[in-house]
Amino acid sequence: MKSDEEKANFIYDYMVMWSLAFKKEYMNYDIQFGTLFPQVLKKAKVPFTRVISTTWSDEALSNIINFDNAVSLIELKNGQLFSNPNVYSVSGKVLYSQLQNREAQRSKSSNNFSEGPFEDFKTLASKSSDNVEKIEVNATIDDALLHITRTETLTGNEKEGVIPTYATAEEICKAWGEPYGVHGYADILSYKKSKGEAAAKERAEADKKEISENFQEEIKNYHDKAPVSIESTEVTSVGQNNTPFTYKVAYTMDGLVKKAGKNLTLSVGQLIGQQTHIEGKERQRTDDIIFSYPRTFVATINVELPSGYNVTPESLQKLNTNLDNEDMRFVTKAEVMGNKLFIHLEKEYKKQIVPVARWQNILEILDRAYDFNNQQVILRKK
């Protein structure tokens, strides 16, 4: 027999699959979710309590002035919270980031929230280790071109909004739908077989075009420049059962390798993606810093050096950094092994909320990450 948590997650993850496939909220209104989901839990004999809260986009619950801003949630005995699934949902086990670390109120009544009694509390806040973006870059120099294969792996709230951006409805339904007897997009449509298959074919054609454009934009945003060519794009894990969402892209860039006499310069810092740059008046701040959630960025860069070239020691030394403070961490380590340059990088946002008095801690790390983004190495001709 499944536990209460397993039964609730089984029910909820079907709703998540539906929302991701159709790119919309499962219910048009939160109050409808607060009615429907409990009815299903009751049939499954899963105990629950009703909760209200607000998102980070609205006022705190204690300051609420418009009940339309209240969000209905359902809580299990173990404290797990469920909200109306939407395009940003990733799993029943991961609370939507907009509802984390927020003032909330639970009612002990399972029938009607207003019956009470009531209890104030704060919703769960995730940790930086829960929300990880991990990239692995393998690059090969070909004269003035750089051939890049990059794998992105996302966990926790880092998956929000990404799944329906890069995975087709067919991929989502096949990966998420197996426990429900769903084998493709046509199976979740309330159509007869022939009409469902036609609708699935039409959706597949639309997804192919849209997702191709999304990957083009992703690569352009990553390097702040369009690639010369895109060789392949592939989603290798769709994030079902709270597993990581993973995709791989292979493409060719110019402008990152340049000749300098007999030597070459490689803009290796560009291989970690664009970094935040704070300048001018933006460096002066009077309010606390509120991030979406704590998170960690991890990058592993492998560059195959062209035959007859090596990395100068001075260039290599500049790629090593170790900064750590109360609120953020930025560490890089570079080494050459054989004919390959290896770089390991980690940037951690330790907290969601940082007092303005510690704004300098944030600037210190962001400045160093931006500096690294602009680092070049000299490849000296032997």
Where are these regions (language model features)?
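A sensor for short, sequence-defined functional sites
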Residues: M1-K382
